[in-house]
């Protein structure tokens, strides 16, 4: 349980020491006329899918908020290696105002709030819309609405962690706005405490809807429902690689692993409450226990990746350790983009441009000096270089993610 909860509750403690006043006025993009986009239920589906695509962009979770800028400021890369780019070197030193880092920081802020603007537009339009517009009526309308609320909470929370001090430092400080309306006007900044309350309010409104859909209305997409004895491995396959398992409802209601689902909500709620401080710890415990007791111990919808899936041949290895992933965004070219960033244009290069720092000092060896930790021996690659020796295998393509996404 400790390992699972640590995965759920981990939060980046660093903050970006930049002024964001100049970026508060972010005008929403409106590429398609509202009357056209929101005139059908399929238009709402397309709008939500477009938001997921934007979340997976390079500026956000497709790069900078996963293996890019965020990994650099959390000291994962060896900034002393001569192969690392100036941007990652500066970010690793927590220097945010250089010619290399400042554009990245600005793009994260602007793209994050543009995604929020699009979510607000979707939320405001779907609220008064009659359920008859949707193929699956109230359930479909509510699902789209709840996912949009949850994504708005998630995006705001990550912007808070990046652009404001930790809650314990100054909870009454006001650093950035919580935008819950679709408008171009500058919005007053919230205190950290009020900001977190707004995050939790969005999650609370979405919680019962997602719970009902994922555990009662259509649980078939959350676990290996067609198997006599489902395992965490096959449950993960159903969520992330639905493929031939899709029923008559269609792909939009499957692939729940790459859509914000009820398990993801419980995990995010626990993280937010831990970040918020002692007054919220009980709520964090409640969410984490439900996730662990119900969906790990009882239903086994999630679990730990078996050793045989890690120690096998690299081409078959589950380097994402995927059986307990609650939610992930789909990006078709992720492996290609990461390979290009690590090795450059030369397929024969043996020098990584994103070398991991402090390896193998992070892992213990046995009394003979041999390292037996699977994370080091099977999930981290090595080169013959000294300062650029180690690199992650996490983004190596694995069998679990080879089938096409519904948005291909």
Report each predicted region and the residues it spans.
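A short, hydrophobic C-terminal helix/tail in secreted or cell-surface proteins
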Residues: 404-408
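Conserved, well-structured interaction surfaces
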Residues: 45, 53, 85-163, 183-197, ...
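Membrane-proximal, proline-rich intrinsically disordered regions
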Residues: 20-74, 331
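Aromatic-residue-lined binding/catalytic grooves and analogous aromatic/hydrophobic interfacial grooves
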Residues: 21, 262-263, 268-302
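Elongated scaffold/linker segments in the mid-to-C-terminal portions of large proteins
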Residues: 100-103, 212, 222, 228-234, ...
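Short coil/turn linking the two alpha-helices of tandem helical-hairpin repeats
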Residues: 160-161, 167, 275-278
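Bacterial Sec-dependent N-terminal signal peptides
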Residues: 1-29
């Amino acid at each position: 349980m400790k390992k699972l909860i640590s995965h759920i509750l981990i939060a980046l403690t660093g903050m970006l020491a930049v002024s964001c006043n100049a970026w508060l006025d972010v005008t929403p993009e409106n590429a398609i006329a509202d009357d056209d986009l929101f005139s059908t239920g399929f238009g709402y589906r397309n709008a939500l899918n477009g938001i997921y695509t934007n979340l997976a962009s390079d500026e956000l979770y497709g790069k900078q908020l996963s293996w890019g800028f965020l990994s650099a400021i959390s000291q994962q890369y060896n900034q002393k290696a001569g192969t690392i780019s100036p941007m990652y070197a500066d970010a690793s030193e927590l220097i945010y105002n250089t010619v290399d880092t400042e554009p990245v920081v600005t793009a994260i802020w602007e793209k994050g709030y543009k995604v929020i603007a699009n979510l607000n537009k979707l939320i405001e339009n779907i609220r008064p819309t009659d359920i008859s517009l949707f193929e699956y009526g109230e359930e479909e309308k509510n699902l789209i609405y709840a996912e949009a609320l949850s994504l708005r909470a998630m995006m705001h929370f990550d912007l808070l962690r990046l652009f404001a001090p930790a809650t314990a430092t100054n909870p009454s400080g006001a650093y950035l706005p919580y935008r819950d309306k679709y408008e171009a006007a500058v919005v007053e900044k919230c205190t950290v405490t009020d900001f977190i309350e707004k995050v939790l309010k969005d999650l609370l409104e979405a919680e019962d809807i997602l719970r009902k859909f994922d555990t009662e209305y259509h649980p078939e997409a959350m676990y290996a429902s067609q198997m006599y004895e489902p395992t965490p491995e096959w449950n993960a396959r159903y969520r992330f690689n639905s493929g031939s398992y899709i029923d008559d409802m269609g792909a939009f209601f499957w692939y729940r692993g790459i859509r914000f689902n009820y398990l993801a909500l419980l995990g995010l709620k626990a993280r937010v409450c831990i970040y918020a401080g002692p007054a919220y710890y009980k709520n964090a415990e409640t969410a984490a226990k439900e996730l662990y007791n119900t969906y790990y111990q009882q239903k086994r919808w999630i679990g730990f990746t078996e050793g045989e899936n890690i120690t096998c041949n690299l081409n078959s290895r589950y380097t994402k350790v995927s059986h307990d992933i609650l939610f992930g965004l789909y990006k078709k070219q992720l492996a290609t983009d990461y390979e290009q960033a690590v090795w450059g244009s030369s397929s024969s290069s043996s020098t990584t441009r994103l070398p991991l720092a402090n390896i193998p000092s992070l892992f213990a060896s046995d009394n003979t000096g041999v390292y037996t930790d699977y994370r080091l021996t099977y999930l981290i690659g090595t080169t013959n270089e000294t300062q650029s020796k180690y690199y992650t295998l996490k983004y190596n393509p694995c069998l679990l993610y080879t089938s096409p996404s519904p948005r291909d």
